[in-house]
Design a protein with these regions (language model features):
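Short loop/turn segments that flank or connect secondary-structure elements
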Residues: 1-235
Length: 235
């Protein structure tokens, strides 16, 4: 199942262009985006991909390369949950304002430099946001997958404390393209090529502008922007 309302919306990431972050107060000047608490890993493959990517990074793209090398990039909670390590109150991969290569995710910068999709280097949750796939077991034993937007509640109790969240902010819905178009690589990775092709075809038809045909009559102007056709005549 798909949340076609969100996927056909014009949402766009506002990092560095108005994003207020996910702290308890507005903090756009910190340019932390949604990276203040690190990224929780989904599985072993997620950890392996990110640690391999980190091993290729150097200080030209990664502000905290020395810290990452010496102390590692992972943290493990008491319950075994693995996440990216925090350095100076944000993700170890987050370059801060004033860094020569620019603020933002060092893994994202590396993906741009290498000419590869960011999903090949970043943690799953990071490249998927603000899209979320949730799999649930149906009573008949099948698995029902739902692809929707990531909401506050998906962050757990801490989500309620966010001063701002981008999928609730009207200013984040002014993008040039619909989400299913701007995040096509991510959706393909989450659903598979065949399913994405069906989704894209459905949404293409859903949002494609329609030509309104208005028949003109003597003494009456055709509506602006409509395509006029001659009035029907008998045969």
């Amino acid at each position: 199942m798909f949340d076609v309302t969100f996927l056909s919306s014009k949402w766009e990431c506002l990092y560095g262009r108005g994003c207020q972050g996910v702290l308890t107060g507005a903090a756009p000047e910190l340019e932390q985006g949604c990276c203040s608490y690190g990224a929780h890993f989904t599985d072993d493959a997620d950890v392996e991909r990110v640690t391999k990517a980190a091993s290729r990074l150097d200080g030209s793209l990664w502000q905290f390369a020395d810290e990452g090398r010496s102390g590692g990039v992972l943290e493990v909670d008491s319950d075994g949950t693995r996440s990216t390590r925090l350095v100076d109150d944000a993700c170890v991969f987050l370059n801060r304002p004033g860094f020569a290569a620019g603020p933002g995710c060092a893994l994202h910068l590396a993906a741009i430099a290498e000419g590869v999709p960011a999903l090949e280097l970043k943690p799953d949750v990071c490249w998927q946001l603000p899209i979320r796939r949730e799999d649930t077991d149906a009573v008949d034993g099948s698995v029902v997958s739902t692809v929707t937007q990531w909401e506050r509640k998906h962050w757990g109790k801490g989500g309620d404390e966010f001063h701002w969240w981008c999928t609730e902010a009207p200013e984040a819905f002014g993008g040039r393209n619909a989400v299913y178009q701007s995040m096509k690589d991510e959706l393909r990775a989450m659903t598979g090529d065949d399913v994405f092709a069906e989704l894209a075809a459905y949404l293409d038809a859903k949002i494609r502008p329609r030509t309104v045909v208005v028949r003109s009559t003597p003494g009456r102007a055709t509506h602006a922007g409509a395509e006029a056709t001659p009035p029907a005549t008998g045969t």
